[in-house]
Amino acid sequence: DFFTGMFDTSLGEGQIVTGVRFPVPERADYQKFVQPASRFALVGVFVAKYADGVRVAVTGASESGVFRWSEAEAALSANFSADAVPAAPGPEGMIGDIHGSPDYRAHLIAVMTKRAVAAAA
């Protein structure tokens, strides 16, 4: 709800963030596939396992910024294993540029999610 798009938030004029709270997950890991020249994430995935389920956040891939991959969250909530990660999400809405096509970025999301789950397990 806070991020409304790429480099855009819901903060109004004159507002500032004074605090942020995150629940501590039972297990978590962040994996990124870096763009060599900039070292920014071509795709980054954060996986966090909580008592009530799993959260999967994706960065660097979408035209609208950070998003949660709900299909992976559902699959990993049932079975927290790299083998449970679904096939790559569709390329719709993914960034396409000289560093990677939307299809490539979608594929990387699944790969980085599997790596994050394996590292957190």
Predicted regions mapped to residue ranges:
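C-terminal structural segment of proteins
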Residues: 1-121
